[in-house]
């Protein structure tokens, strides 16, 4: 396997091996080692045709053509299966150093994993399973073979193809270059939330997803052994990295991730201009002084352009609705809290900038 040193940057040229992955994989609960995660990455790489098909059709519950799915396998005690044939070189191994692969596959047979439940109004998937007694059901790996046949529960294949819950892309070579299992999990998370600029997660949920043992009971251990090393490993070497802050204490503590991405100056200028123009017209539509935008926009990072635009849209929509409601009420104080639109917008945006918990979505809910 190609080894990439800590100081070797992974630029955008490394993105040609991007893999699609449903967002639920980033939240998978299980005591998965680094090699287990790499095996999962390889298995997902064999589902790319099916994932691309579902993503391109954009219809809930669409059936994937049989030709795009792994071959049907034997009926096991756990039900129907699908078999994926994998070259051992895909794991970064050669026939001479793959002896322990059998051990890792054996571990995955009895490795319980749980995906997040999926619920969305008007969309029912009665056949969907979220909890599995093993990530795989069986494997066939003859001595000296250059390939291994891995059997997956058919219900697991369906779960890995649940694009209705959202999906993301990440670089396979980048994920394989990471040498810490927790950093891989964080890499998946920030890739799935990059369009939102960041996310908030409770400490208890973070522990649960990463299956942290008693050695991480103290938050200081999580900071020193997981968050800080992951941030340092990704920053400057990957085209996507993160900053983080914590709020609260004890089990009420929240970790807030701010996601950073490498973009060209041209792309930054183009998207900044678009967001500026839309925000300018939105503020003008509610009678706000557009100089507010000049004062605040200089503080907006590229990753926060979309969240900033969303915030301005929410503010102006709320102001319009409040004014409309006030016309039908006799209470003169009903609209008092936004009687000064400029002060209201400025205060709301300043609070949005100062508190990352307001800026980003809480994924623990």
Question: What would you call each of these model-derived segments?
Answer:
Residues 1-295, 299-312, 316-365:
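Charged, alpha-helix-forming regions
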């Amino acid at each position: 396997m190609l080894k990439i040193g800590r100081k070797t940057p992974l630029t955008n040229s490394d993105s040609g091996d991007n893999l699609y992955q449903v967002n639920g994989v980033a939240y998978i609960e299980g005591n998965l080692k680094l090699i287990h995660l790499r095996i999962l990455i390889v298995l997902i790489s064999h589902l790319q045709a099916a994932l691309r098909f579902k993503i391109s059709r954009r219809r809930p519950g669409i059936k994937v053509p049989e030709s795009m799915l792994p071959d049907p396998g034997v009926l096991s005690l756990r039900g129907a299966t699908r078999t994926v044939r994998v070259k051992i070189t895909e794991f970064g191994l050669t026939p001479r150093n793959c002896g322990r692969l059998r051990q890792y596959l054996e571990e995955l047979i009895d490795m319980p994993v749980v995906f997040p439940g999926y619920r969305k109004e008007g969309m029912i998937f009665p056949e969907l399973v979220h909890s599995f007694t093993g990530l795989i059901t069986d494997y066939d790996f003859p001595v000296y073979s250059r390939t291994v046949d891995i059997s997956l529960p058919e219900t697991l294949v369906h779960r890995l193809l649940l694009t209705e819950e959202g999906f993301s892309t990440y670089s396979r070579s980048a994920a394989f270059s990471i040498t810490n299992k927790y950093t891989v999990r964080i890499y998946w998370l920030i890739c799935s939330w990059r369009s939102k600029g960041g996310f908030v997660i409770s400490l208890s949920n973070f522990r649960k997803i990463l299956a942290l043992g008693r050695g991480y009971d103290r938050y200081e251990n999580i900071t020193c052994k997981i968050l800080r090393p992951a941030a340092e490993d990704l920053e400057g070497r990957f085209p996507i990295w993160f900053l983080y802050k914590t709020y609260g204490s004890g089990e009420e503590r929240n970790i807030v991730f701010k996601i950073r991405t490498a973009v060209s100056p041209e792309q930054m200028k183009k998207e900044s201009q678009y967001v500026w123009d839309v925000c300018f017209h939105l503020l003008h539509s509610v009678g706000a002084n557009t100089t507010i935008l000049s004062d605040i926009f200089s503080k907006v990072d590229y990753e926060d352009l979309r969240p900033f635009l969303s915030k301005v849209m929410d503010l102006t929509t709320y102001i319009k609705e409040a004014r409309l409601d006030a016309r039908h009420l006799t209470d003169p104080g009903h609209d008092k809290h936004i009687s000064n639109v400029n002060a209201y917008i400025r205060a709301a945006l300043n609070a949005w900038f100062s508190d990352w918990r307001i800026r980003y979505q809480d994924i623990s809910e």
